[in-house]
């Protein structure tokens, strides 16, 4: 019995048969529904998405940067355990790392769909242009994926060995696990360093390098993408952890949830500052290159999405609710079912706001193009 209890520490409880069947049916339905639209894309090209010379990017790119940011943010959260060794985040570390790999694959699928000729994407891997920011970003993405996959495999191997040795650990098993733990920590450090030039920081750097879009150009864009990634990942991980625990009929770890909520609250404050510094300088400068795009967001056709969707639902309400739950609500209420639902609604609002922020950053800048003279 004691051995079985120790094994459960390392291996999560399996899903029920009913939950597995329901999940398989949902995935099958989504795959069948998406197959038609994928065929339409391959058969009819980008015309089915309404792409033009003036609006070359659209919702696919928005979804791409959402998932790439989610991948980078989840990896950073997993590094709280695998690099910094903060024990309270241990219950969600492996989930964060696994979801990071999945999100990165999904982001690459969406950017592949956005390419005019998907078959030409192989050329970006085979040929390298030293002066191309896109070429550097693709290489950083591939390196980041190799690191993340290798680390995830080692984590699974380490957890399996820990479960097998839970009853009678030997010195040899402890030595092997120690070596694997060191390798995991080294890979985590490499992955965190790569995140500044890969997902999520590299995506922001790529946008900031586009001189023809005044809203994107500038150093704050890269910081904005980085903070957006942490905010989105924290909210997503809280929702996913609660949902999976409910499907397993288990109780989520309260300490891990409190830690994630604190990360979310702090990163929301940082995101608010980043959004302010992204839009305030262009408005104050009056430069048409960027002020026009910001005007579209704050007072033009995209204003309802900005003020109601992003500011109110995505920033103000979640920040106020998370701050109240963490620092001002009674301890008993913080652990109640009502508080859990309030936190769930707050996290859902953050996810909506994070998607809208990426949508606004991409779409508001597209109608405004700067003519860059040839040098």
Where in this protein do the model-derived segments appear?
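N-terminal signal-anchor module of multipass membrane proteins
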Residues: 1-73, 77, 359, 363-371
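Structured alpha-helical bundle/scaffold domains in large eukaryotic membrane-trafficking regulators
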Residues: 3, 117, 161, 285-288, ...
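Long, contiguous internal "core" modules enriched in hydrophobic/ aromatic residues
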Residues: 10-14, 20, 24-36, 88, ...
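Transmembrane-helix bundle segments that line or gate the permeation/cavity pathway
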Residues: 36-49, 53-54, 66-127, 133-167, ...
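Hydrophobic alpha-helical transmembrane segments of multi-pass small-molecule transporters/permeases
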Residues: 61-66, 94-95, 104-108, 135, ...
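Membrane-interfacial helical/loop segments at transmembrane boundaries in membrane proteins
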Residues: 122-126, 288-297, 368-375
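Final/C-terminal transmembrane alpha-helix of multipass membrane proteins
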Residues: 345-364
């Amino acid at each position: 019995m004691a051995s079985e209890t120790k094994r459960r520490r390392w291996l999560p409880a399996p899903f029920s048969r009913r939950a597995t069947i329901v999940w398989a049916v949902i995935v099958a339905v989504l795959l069948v529904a998406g197959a038609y639209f994928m065929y339409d894309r391959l058969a009819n090209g980008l015309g089915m998405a309404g792409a033009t010379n003036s609006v070359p990017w659209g919702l696919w790119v928005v979804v791409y940067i959402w998932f790439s940011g989610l991948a980078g943010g989840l990896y950073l959260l997993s590094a709280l355990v695998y690099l910094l060794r903060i024990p309270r985040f241990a219950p969600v570390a492996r989930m964060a790392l696994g979801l990071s790999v999945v999100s990165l694959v999904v982001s690459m699928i969406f950017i592949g769909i956005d390419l005019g000729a998907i078959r030409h994407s192989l050329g970006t891997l085979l040929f390298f242009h030293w002066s191309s920011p896109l070429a550097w970003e693709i290489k950083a993405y591939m390196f980041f994926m190799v690191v993340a996959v290798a680390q995830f495999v080692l984590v699974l191997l380490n957890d399996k060995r820990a479960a097998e040795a839970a009853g009678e650990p030997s010195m040899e098993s402890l030595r092997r696990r120690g070596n694997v733990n060191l390798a995991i920590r080294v890979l985590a450090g490499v992955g965190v360093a790569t995140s500044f030039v890969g997902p999520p920081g590299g995506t922001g750097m790529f946008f900031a390098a586009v001189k023809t879009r005044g809203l994107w150009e500038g150093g704050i864009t890269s910081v904005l993408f980085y903070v957006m990634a942490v905010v989105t990942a924290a909210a997503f991980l809280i929702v996913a952890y609660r949902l999976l625990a409910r499907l397993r009929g288990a109780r989520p770890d309260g300490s891990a949830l409190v830690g994630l909520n604190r990360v979310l609250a702090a990163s929301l404050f940082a995101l608010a500052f980043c959004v302010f510094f992204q839009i305030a300088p262009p408005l104050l400068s009056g430069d048409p290159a960027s002020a026009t795009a910001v005007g579209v967001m704050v007072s033009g056709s995209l204003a309802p999405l900005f003020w109601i969707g992003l500011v109110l639902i995505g920033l103000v309400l979640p920040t106020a609710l998370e701050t109240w739950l963490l620092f001002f609500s009674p301890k008993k209420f913080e652990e109640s079912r009502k508080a859990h639902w309030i936190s769930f609604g707050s996290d859902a609002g953050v996810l909506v706001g994070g998607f809208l922020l990426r949508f606004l950053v991409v779409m508001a800048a597209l109608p405004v193009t700067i003519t860059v003279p040839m040098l």
